[in-house]
Regions:
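Histidine phosphotransfer helical core of two-component systems
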Residues: 2, 9-13, 24-62
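Short conserved segment of the HATPase_c
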Residues: 167-178
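Detector for a conserved hydrophobic position within an alpha-helical segment of the HATPase_c
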Residues: 198-199
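Conserved micro-motifs of the catalytic ATP-binding
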Residues: 78-80, 116-119, 182
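Conserved catalytic submotifs in the C-terminal HATPase_c
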Residues: 105-115
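Short beta-strand/loop element within the Bergerat-fold HATPase_c
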Residues: 142-154
Length: 225
C-alpha cells in the first residue's frame, strides 16, 4: 500500500469501526432505559444493587462513546468556523458546565483586558476540556486546578495548572504524543487533539512542570488584528 494513502485509509477505518460500535452501544442505552422504566413503573424504587449495576453499564457506554469521539477527532481534519471571541468567556463557560469532583477546587483567573481572538471556539472549548480532564484525573485524592486567561503583545493564553504530581519524567512534550497515557483507562489522544486544534488556528500548546506545584499546560492563540 502506498504510504501517502495511509491517512485516508485510517480515516475510513476509524469511521467504519465507530459506526459498527456505536450501533450496539445505542441499542444497549435504549435497552437500559427500557429496563429502568419497567422496573420503576408506578413509582417503584429500583433495588439498590440493580441500580448500581445499571449505573456501571451506563458509565461504560459513555466511556466507549468518548473513546470513539477521540478516535474520530484525531483522524479527521476539522473544518474551522472562526469568529471573534473572548477567552474570559471560554474559561467561564467551561467552569460553569464542568462536573468538578467534590475533592477538587476549581479557580478562575480572568484577564482584566479580555483580549479578542479570532478562533473556532468550539474547537478551543474541546481542547480546554481535554486539558482540564487531564488535570482533574491527575489528582484522584483531590487538589486545586486554576484556569487563567492572559496575554502578551502578540498572543492570548489559556493556562490550566494543577496541584498534582506533575508530568511524567518532567518532559512536557511527551504528553502531546499520540497514545501516550499514564492512566489505567483511556487511549491517550486528548492532549494530542488539543494541540492539533490549536496549531490549525496558528496557535501552540505547551506543557511544563511547576516545581512542587504540579503541571501547567498553556494554549496560546494569536491576538486579533
Amino acid at each position: 500500500m502506498d504510504k501517502k494513502n495511509e491517512p485516508d485509509l485510517l480515516k475510513q477505518m476509524s469511521s467504519a469501526v465507530s459506526h459498527e460500535i456505536r450501533n450496539p452501544l445505542a441499542i444497549i442505552s435504549n435497552s437500559l432505559y427500557f429496563i429502568k422504566t419497567k422496573l420503576g413503573a408506578g413509582g417503584a424504587a429500583l433495588d439498590p444493587k440493580v441500580a448500581k449495576h445499571i449505573g456501571i453499564v451506563e458509565g461504560e457506554v459513555k466511556h466507549s462513546n468518548d473513546v470513539i469521539e477521540e478516535m474520530l477527532a484525531f483522524c479527521r481534519t476539522r473544518e474551522l468556523k472562526c469568529a471573534p471571541a473572548s477567552l474570559n468567556a471560554a474559561i467561564k463557560d467551561l467552569a460553569g458546565s464542568y462536573p468538578v469532583p467534590p475533592a477538587v477546587t476549581l479557580k478562575l483567573a480572568a484577564d482584566p483586558v479580555d483580549p479578542c481572538v479570532n478562533a473556532d471556539m468550539e474547537a478551543i472549548g474541546y481542547a480546554l476540556r481535554c486539558v482540564l480532564d487531564n488535570a482533574v484525573q491527575a489528582m484522584p485524592e483531590g487538589g486545586t486546578v486554576t484556569m487563567e486567561a492572559s496575554h502578551d503583545a502578540k498572543l492570548a493564553h489559556l493556562t490550566i495548572a494543577d496541584s498534582g504530581p506533575g508530568l511524567p519524567g518532567g518532559d512536557g512534550e511527551q504528553v502531546f504524543e499520540p497514545f501516550f497515557t499514564t492512566k489505567p483507562r483511556g487511549i491517550g489522544l486528548g492532549l494530542t487533539i488539543a494541540r492539533k486544534y490549536l496549531e490549525q488556528q496558528g496557535g501552540t500548546a505547551r506543557a511544563k512542570n511547576v516545581p512542587g506545584r504540579g503541571a501547567r499546560i498553556t494554549l496560546s492563540l494569536p491576538l486579533s488584528a
